[in-house]
Amino acid sequence: LAADDLNADGFDDLAIGAPGEAFGTRTNVGMSHLLMGSANGLTTAGNYAVAQGDGAPGAWAGGERFAASLATGDVTGDGAADLVVGTPGDWVRSQRSAGSATVLHGSPSSRVGTNASVLTQSGALPGGAEANDAVGASVAVGDLDEDGYGDVIVGAPDESFGSSTGAGMVGIR
């Protein structure tokens, strides 16, 4: 669960992770349900869901567990909170369960996920993508360097370091 003002309307919205959500015969694909806030609290109007291939980059694949972890904060500095979604089972460069974190940018004029950034160890995060690293098993947002922008913090509990398997890693972007 994560709550913040994703559409900059002055009311907190609620993101609910459903990493076990299935699509057809594919199990544990994952999805995030977004409930929009209003002056009267959470409403049924304007609610929607985001999944890989449906509002977020990527494609539906079993076992990826999209939305296993969630965090919010204004990463872009535009006044709308952004939603960070952990996908610890994501395939990255043919590496099963290497994992990723996706920043779904909040906006007053469009749905979360219209613009997105995917963070993996084959790009924005330190290290190289390896099978079973589980990048995105935990995510957080905080302004660690006090520059006014939220920094994305991504955990990978099964990252190996040298000959130490499962040593873990925290990446900050």
Locate predicted features.
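Blade-edge motifs of beta-propeller repeat domains
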Residues: M31-R65, S100-A134, A167-R173
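Generic detector of contiguous secondary-structure segments
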Residues: F11, R26-N28, A68, P88, ...
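Short glycine/acidic-enriched loop and turn motifs that connect beta-strands
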Residues: G20-T25, G89-S94, D158-S163
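Beta-propeller blade termini
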Residues: L1-F11, A67-A80, G136-Y149
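Hydrophobic beta-strand segments that make up the repeating blades of beta-propeller
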Residues: L14-A18, L83-T87, V152-A156
